[in-house]
């Protein structure tokens, strides 16, 4: 795991403390994600609103009017839309965090993909 270890740890802490079950999905509130990306929550919500087609129901739900919860897919989609340097770093760390969790449990996404025995 390369990158900003303090940011990685902040993401890990936020996920452990702020994640909750909503409508059968594990989610995090937009306000908590905004804190990690260091963007104003209104900016984050505007980004979601203006890119609604990028957030299907398995990525995001609207908790209250204009207040959102995001799954891991929504968190990753949002990170790709934000432009600040901190947001770019946080986006990379979120990806590394989620992949780290898979590897920690002995799972690799590539191991799950059927390759028909293709090798170089």
Q: Where are the regions a protein language model picked out?
A:
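An anion-engaging/catalytic patch
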Residues: 1-108
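Well-ordered alpha/beta subsegment
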Residues: 105-120
